[in-house]
Amino acid sequence: AQCTDERVNKVTAVLFKNYDTPEKMITLTQEELEKYIFSCGFYHNKSAHILSASRDIIEKFGGEVPDSLEKLRTLAGVGRKTANVVYAVAFGGNAIAVDTHVFRVSNRLGIAEGKTPEKVEDGLREAIPEELWSKAHHYLIYHGRRVCHSQKPDCINCTLKDYCKYFNNK
């Protein structure tokens, strides 16, 4: 993984103590911001995106993080996955963000098969009722972290093995 959620939470806790708004964020130089986020990897690109997105939030959205997927995706460094996470977590919207865990578990179970995150997201949207998208996203991540590991999935102890395409085709 580029950076674990645990690492992101530690880094943002320190960063947001002093820079918790776009207005405060843009007072940092890119080099200063890089020092805060260095441990997350790809810090040079991420710092440039954070500063650009902060400026856009101020200039285009009056200092407020946009609350639609379409507007979120106009921000530098914000793709489909990040927009879905922000939309679901910050605004309570129904969204499925396809990370490595969601991608793997969805394909293995046969819920949504695809070679790209976009195809898997589309398949999950079709297979799961919209009001459950955000919960399903979290359940799939949890299952991928705890049971359905990328290298050695714990199929024997998996409660979903009877329904799992991967397990049943071994």
Task: Give short role names for the model-derived ranges.
Residues A1-K170:
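Catalytic cores of DNA base-excision repair glycosylases
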